[in-house]
């Protein structure tokens, strides 16, 4: 391959400008599902890394390798700091980490939220981080309790209808 258009300095510096992923200051509570997801992600990243290291010679590929290595450092740090919480050990009377909580808002709409670890949170499927304002409002509460969910667009009052834990 002709090297006429290759910026040698840029090629050697590939991956140097990758910013580390921030690690949360909070305890790293994870559900069994969350721990498995992190382990699966670690395996996937290792496979991608092996493939790219065997086939990459260009700057883009070296940048991609640096990104994967960065993500791998993050995932390994999260696995090392993981505090596994088994839902079976939680009180079914109280909203605790790992709970799926069914609530009703002031207009009668019923919603379900699953309180999970920070790396597991996904608002599109109603999995909320245990450090989120919603989870903080729900944690420690019982069925029939009313809580206020403080949101930037306005507070909502929620009544807890049901609490359960996946086994």
Question: What does each of the following model-derived ranges do?
Answer:
Residues 1-78:
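Helix-rich terminal scaffold detector
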Residues 8, 162-167:
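Short, charged, intrinsically disordered terminal tails
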Residues 58-66, 73-76, 107-110, 120-123, ...:
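A broad, low-specificity signal for short, low-complexity segments enriched in glycine/proline
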Residues 80-90:
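Active-site phosphate-binding and catalytic loops of NTP-dependent enzymes
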Residues 89-153:
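Non-DNA-binding regulatory cores of transcription-related proteins
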Residues 115, 160-162:
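Conserved hydrophobic positions within beta-strands
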Residues 156:
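Short glycine/proline-centered loop/turn elements that form peptide/ligand docking sites
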